[in-house]
UniProtKB/Swiss-Prot annotation:
Disulfide bonds, paired cysteine numbers: 309-318, 317-380, 346-411, 350-413
Keyword list, A-Z: Cleavage on pair of basic residues, Disulfide bond, Extracellular matrix, Glycoprotein, Growth factor, Mitogen, Secreted, Signal
MF (Gene Ontology): amyloid-beta binding; cytokine activity; growth factor activity; protein homodimerization activity; signaling receptor binding; transforming growth factor beta receptor binding; type II transforming growth factor beta receptor binding; type III transforming growth factor beta receptor binding
The protein's name: Transforming growth factor beta-2 proprotein
Gene: TGFB2
Glycosylation sites: 72, 140, 241
Length: 435
């Protein structure tokens, strides 16, 4: 009686586990490509937080040079990052996740010895410039895992608007008059009159560049989303030809008098209160001893990337080329740049060495009966993905966005779920025999 109850419980539990396993059914290549294209359509709209493509408007005759400049510099940054990773054979991500990180704080140096603030004569109404000296960390440049820029937004009761969208840019060294002068990093919508708060931005790529090329450290620029007009974040509405000043105020950057009203005693008290809120960088680095202890001669698996897959005819799991033309494949005209991109996808068989546990005929039979569409073998899935930068229009307004995980660069065979299923089956079976 006890054994029957246990068997029923085992079957119910295995049914639940099997049904929860991801399926990996075989598809012909044409069908797979069609599904991949539709998945990309959904991905782009979802990442842009759109429920449907924007309405089609006539394409602008000429995109403003400053917009093209930001798009090109952001795109080039991603390409440089990919090239560095490929050329340097970066350490496996598992090392970065496993080892403890050493954290370093680098404060923004004061503009003047007596007061870390911009005096009225240097006041810039539309943007702020922030610089850091990271030269002390250059010797550990290869150990950098992450860098964050943190700045404290102060309450500004004098603000004329309740909220603004501020953007962070890396200032670039101009090679000539046509080269870009800044590179977009990130943006945030802030409440100008609300209580103060810390704002954090991921600036890993910028700091990595500074550590390797000291002459490129020109700092960051905090500016408005649309300084030549007025941008309303709540409804994304733009009022043209009405310049908007940066109403957000930042500790250690803006002079106390620009956001505080009152006598000298009040101003001094406010300055003291914000003295420990200087803009700073937080650098997270792998400790040197952790790197030295690693075995440098570990055998690495062959990468199933373009370098291997595109020059070999493979039936097994490999990277497959797929170019998406936005107009032809998706019927979209609202993405201005690029016209398309190499999305790629993973497909092919994954040879599997069956263990004695998983080879058990009863295990296979039960697994296939419970979920006939599930694959007992590993699936060919993406391993490395890269972002895509797009320049698109909503109405007549140009926007630049970076979409994460849009380009498949390499593939792998996922670990089979059948092994876990078999272990669960045998553990319950052994429990039943003991009973």
């Amino acid at each position: 009686m006890h054994y029957c109850v246990l068997s029923a419980f085992l079957l119910l539990h295995l049914v639940t586990v099997a049904l929860s396993l991801s399926t990996c059914s075989t598809l012909d290549m044409d069908q797979f490509m069609r599904k991949r294209i539709e998945a990309i359509r959904g991905q782009i709209l979802s990442k842009l937080k759109l429920t449907s493509p924007p309405e089609d408007y006539p394409e602008p005759e000429e995109v403003p040079p400053e917009v093209i400049s930001i798009y090109n510099s952001t795109r080039d940054l991603l390409q440089e990052k990919a090239s560095r990773r490929a050329a340097a054979c970066e350490r496996e991500r598992s090392d970065e996740e496993y080892y403890a990180k050493e954290v370093y704080k680098i404060d923004m140096p004061p503009f003047f010895p007596s007061e870390n603030a911009i005096p009225p004569t240097f006041y810039r109404p539309y943007f702020r410039i922030v610089r850091f000296d990271v030269s002390a960390m250059e010797k550990n440049a290869s150990n950098l895992v992450k860098a964050e820029f943190r700045v404290f937004r102060l309450q500004n009761p004098k603000a004329r608007v309740a909220e603004q969208r501020i953007e962070l840019y890396q200032i670039l060294k101009s090679k000539d008059l046509t080269s870009p002068t800044q590179r977009y990093i990130d943006s945030k919508v802030v409440k100008t009159r609300a209580e103060g708060e810390w704002l954090s931005f991921d600036v890993t790529d910028a700091v990595h560049e500074w550590l390797h090329h000291k002459d490129r450290n020109l700092g960051f620029k905090i500016s408005l989303h649309c300084p030549c007009c007025t941008f309303v974040p709540s409804n994304n509405y733009i009022i043209p030809n009405k310049s908007e000043e940066l109403e957000a105020r930042f500790a250690g950057i803006d002079g106390t008098s620009t956001y505080t009203s009152g006598d000298q005693k009040t101003i001094k008290s406010t300055r003291k209160k914000n003295s420990g809120k200087t803009p700073h960088l937080l650098l997270m680095l792998l400790p040197s001893y952790g790197l030295e202890s690693q075995q440098s001669n570990r055998r690495k698996k062959r990468a199933l990337d373009a370098a291997y897959c595109f020059r070999n005819v493979q039936d097994n799991c490999c990277l497959r080329p797929l170019y998406i033309d936005f107009k032809r494949d998706l019927g979209w005209k609202w993405i201005h740049e690029p016209k398309g991109y190499n999305a790629n996808f993973c497909a092919g068989a994954c040879p599997y060495l069956w263990s004695s546990d998983t080879q058990h005929s009863r295990v296979l039979s039960l697994y296939n009966t419970i979920n006939p569409e599930a694959s007992a073998s590993p699936c060919c899935v993406s391993q490395d993905l890269e972002p895509l930068t797009i320049l698109y229009y909503i109405g007549k307004t140009p926007k630049i966005e970076q979409l994460s995980n849009m380009i498949v660069k390499s593939c792998k065979c996922s670990k089979t779920k059948l092994a876990a299923f078999a272990r669960l089956y045998h553990s319950h079976s052994n429990l039943g025999s003991e009973t």
